[in-house]
């Protein structure tokens, strides 16, 4: 079986898992590209990315250019003379000069069934939209944003209680083996690339903290999906005022949908050991696991034990 010389480009833990799979394979990782070290923690000390840490453990040369558009960075990469470049959540734009360097091109592992959910947050957007299925796509990169020709897909069902955390874990199970499968057949021409249909595409924009606020004027089903999509970050939330008039921001980690009632959206219908039930535009959202500021996530009953006055029945949030 042909052993390929690979440049790996990636930054977060998701990418490091793929690098580990390559290191465990018969292929040869000859260089690693990752984002420059960034300040982290209270001390703002420079911290290496998970990919860099793993590469250094295996004595693989690490390159951290701020940009790949400069001639110096491109010539440095050209000298490595790799067969293929594997890109997983790298974070830098690859110009055409770089894309054309390896003889087998640049492969990208993307966390959706392209062309659906191109962009930075495919896992979260798929859950929020109510998709029943997602997966991973391995593609040949071009200069567009996740627009390259597709080589291989693996499908994955989205469970009714799926969170971004659990779906991420599912995709992490299927993605590295799929990457190795493609690499093993790439040099033999086993994979016929398929162009993406732009008409079928949609964009998975990066999540923002502003989007995390719950809007009671949409359906309970949409809100429940919102909560699962925004778990573990940035976490869905709503605000209420305490008896002193202070605003209390409450994060929500888990909720359930109940049948419709004819009440103004945002009205607290009940607050007891079974949850905090809020009327929405369609249906009732039963809040089950919440987190007030400065506390750990807790069941609704535990929050009500200490803060029942925040949730009087009939109050409109």
From Swiss-Prot:
Pfam families: Formyl_trans_C (PF02911), Formyl_trans_N (PF00551). InterPro entries: Fmt, Formyl_trans_C, Formyl_trans_C_sf, Formyl_transf_N, Formyl_transf_N_sf, Formyl_transferase-like_C_sf, GART_AS, Met-tRNA-FMT_C. Signal peptide: none annotated. It catalyses: L-methionyl-tRNA(fMet) + (6R)-10-formyltetrahydrofolate = N-formyl-L-methionyl-tRNA(fMet) + (6S)-5,6,7,8-tetrahydrofolate + H(+). Keywords: Protein biosynthesis, Transferase. Its EC number is 2.1.2.9. GO terms for molecular function: methionyl-tRNA formyltransferase activity. GO terms for cellular component: cytosol. (6S)-5,6,7,8-tetrahydrofolate binds at residues 112-115. The keyword Amino-acid biosynthesis does not apply. SUPFAM superfamilies: FMT C-terminal domain-like, Formyltransferase. The keyword Transferase applies. Gene3D superfamilies: Formyl transferase, C-terminal domain, Formyl transferase, N-terminal domain. NCBIfam families: fmt. Belongs to the Fmt family. Attaches a formyl group to the free amino group of methionyl-tRNA(fMet). The formyl group appears to play a dual role in the initiator identity of N-formylmethionyl-tRNA by promoting its recognition by IF2 and preventing the misappropriation of this tRNA by the elongation apparatus. This is Methionyl-tRNA formyltransferase.
């Amino acid at each position: 079986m042909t052993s390929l010389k690979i440049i790996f480009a990636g930054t977060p833990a998701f990418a490091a898992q793929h690098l580990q799979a390559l290191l465990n394979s018969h292929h040869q990782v000859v260089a690693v590209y990752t984002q420059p070290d960034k300040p982290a923690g209270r001390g703002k000390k420079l911290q290496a990315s998970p990919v860099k840490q793993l590469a250094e453990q295996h004595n693989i040369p690490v390159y951290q250019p701020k940009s790949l558009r400069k001639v110096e960075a491109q010539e440095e990469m050209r000298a490595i003379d790799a067969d293929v470049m594997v890109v997983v959540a790298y974070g830098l734009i690859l110009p055409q000069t770089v894309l054309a360097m390896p003889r087998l091109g640049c492969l990208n592992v993307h966390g959706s069934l392209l062309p659906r959910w191109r962009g930075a947050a495919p896992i979260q957007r798929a859950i929020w939209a109510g998709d029943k299925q997602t997966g991973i796509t391995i593609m040949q990169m071009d200069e567009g944003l996740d627009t390259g020709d597709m080589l291989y897909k693996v499908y994955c069902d989205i469970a009714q209680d799926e969170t971004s955390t659990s779906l991420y874990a599912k995709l992490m199970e299927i993605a590295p083996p799929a990457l190795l499968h493609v690499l093993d057949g790439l040099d033999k021409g086993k994979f016929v690339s398929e162009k993406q249909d732009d008409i079928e595409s949609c964009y998975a924009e990066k999540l923002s903290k502003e989007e995390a606020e719950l809007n009671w004027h949409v359906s309970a089903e949409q809100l429940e999906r919102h909560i699962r999509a925004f778990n573990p970050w940035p976490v869905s939330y709503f605000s209420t005022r305490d008896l002193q008039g202070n605003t209390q921001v409450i994060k929500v980690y888990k909720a359930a949908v109940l049948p419709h009632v004819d009440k103004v959206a945002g009205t607290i219908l009940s607050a007891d050991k079974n949850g905090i039930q809020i009327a929405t535009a369609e249906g009732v959202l039963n809040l089950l696991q919440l987190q007030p500021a400065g506390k750990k996530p807790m069941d609704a009953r535990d929050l009500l034990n200490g803060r029942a006055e925040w949730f009087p029945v009939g109050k409109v949030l």
